[in-house]
């Protein structure tokens, strides 16, 4: 019993973590990542694989990773985002749980910053983060993890 519990836990952890280190070549060559936009001199990318956690009714959570990189810098930033969707009230809330500084050449994590007391932000179409939330939702729909709900 304990062995099967350990195996299940290990598989869950492995499914959440990326299968390999992410480096700038992966992002720029679109190996499972999409270019989102350029803002303030930084290029932003999103991982095309997202994790969906079901909630009650039309409520669910999506965990998605985004990355930013600036020109000739040898580091990039990984953001682990949690989007909480409530399709009954048509709201999206967002929290950035963790930020990691990564060596852009090797993919090695240089610094981890966990934010256990990060504040939930309600997203609207004109706020930062909304586009990433909708992109993550569309990736979940495309992967068959969610069904599109129309109000």
Model-predicted regions and their roles:
Residues 4-17:
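Sec-dependent N-terminal signal peptides
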Residues 21-82, 86-151:
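N-terminal secretory-pathway/extracellular module detecting exported/lumenal segments
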